[in-house]
Structures are given as structure tokens and as C-alpha cells.
Amino acid sequence: KKKIHTWGLEINRVTLPNITEKFMNNLPGAEDELENTATALRIFAEAGVPIARQRLAGDTFPQLMTRYQSVHRGGYVSRGESRALTRGELETPNYDELQEWWNRFCDIYSTLVPIAEECGIKLAIHPSDVPNPDTPLGGLGFHRVIDAFPSRSVGYLYCVGTRAESGGSSIVMDEIHNYGRKGRIFMIHLRNVRASLATAEAFEEVLLDDGDMNMFKVLLELQKIGFDGCLNPDHIPNIEGGSSGLAYSIGYIRALLAALAAMP
């Protein structure tokens, strides 16, 4: 943290140690994983980090998707995912398996949430990416999380791109309004995509100005609900020249913020 401060920066969010299949399937050593992540949460809170994210095994169904490289304007390359291209028998967890996953999730949050409340750090959940139907942290899943854990320390690392993969820009605007007015959006992953699982059984990640969403409208909606957290450019496409994609994304976000500030 001290080194980051020497560069004039602040830590906005950290990722806790992963909860793997070992814990989610209740295998030997499972409790060690939970103890490890609980200890890490306390340490980050003591260091003054405001937000922590917990990643969990089993919240996506990668076997349903075929990944490919998509090429876009000027030759830049990005991730594409297609359900339509996937061949063979596609198995997903049944109801009992999904319920067991949820029970294990509740075990984790029942441990972490009291620590977060005591230590003054927020727990931010990222939606399931790819958001296939019945993924545990999809559109219904997050409602389930905040119903089970109504603490103000529990909220969303809201990923605009992931949720657009589910059903386009309309779902993003609705969810920002819904979760934002409840104070549940702690941080934003800002990413644009083309198509969605609902419209094409596929999607492709693109630069912020090159997808289906109007990112200015997204920021305008965030302003309306009073969001004042961090905007994180996410899954940056590869532009020839190393860090050019990151520079382009940051520059574009700064331009959007300047335009927003100039509005009467």
C-alpha cells in the first residue's frame, strides 16, 4: 500500500484467496481455505482496503461455451464465446447440485460478512461470467445473495459487460437502477460487447465505443443513482502495441466523464 501511495494511487479493491472445488465439494482441507480467506479479509481491512471480492469455483458452466478470437475494426483482437458452436452432450448441474453449491456459498458468507461488518470492509460479488441460465450468480442469483445477507457490507462488483452478455443493454440499465438505488453497487467493471446469449447464443468483447451499448448512457444512469465508486476498464481487447488497448480505454472513459461533467 505504501508503494502504491508513492505513485499517487489508492487501492480500490482486492481479490481474496480463491475458494476452490475443495471447499465447494467439501473435500479434505476445505476448512483451511475458508480460514485462509477470512484471515486475508481481516488483513486487507486493517490495511484500509475498502472493497474485497471473493471468487468461487463452480459459478460458471464453461463446458457450454466455445471460445474463439474475434477480429474487429483496425484488426484488434478480442474474446468471443459461442454456445451455438459447442457440440456434444452438454451437462449442467442439476437442482440438488446447485442447491448444495448455494449451501456452501452461505457457509462462506456466514463467516465473511460478520468480519466485513466488524472491520469496515465491503464484500463485492461479481456476476457469473458467462451468464448462462441457472448460473449461481446470474440475474436471480444476486437477488438471492442480498436476500440471504441483507448487510450493507454486501453488494455488487457490477460487471456491465457480463450482464450485457445475458441480454443486452436494457438489462444493464434496469439492474443499475435497481441495485444502485439500494446502494448495492460498490464498483463497476466497464466493458462493451456485441450480441448476447439471448439474441445470438454468442457474444464478442469489443472496445468501449465499438459495441451494442452506449457507454455514455450507462454512466448517465450511474450518475442518476448517485454512484461515486471506481470505474474499472475490463477485459481490454488486444491492440498491436502492447498497452495501447488499456490507454485507449482509459482515455475513452476520461472523455465520457468530461462530457458528463459538462452537462447542465
Region locations from a protein language model:
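Short, structured patches in soluble enzyme cores that scaffold and shape functional sites
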Residues: 105, 123-129
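Structural motif corresponding to the early beta-alpha repeats
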Residues: 1-106, 118, 162, 223
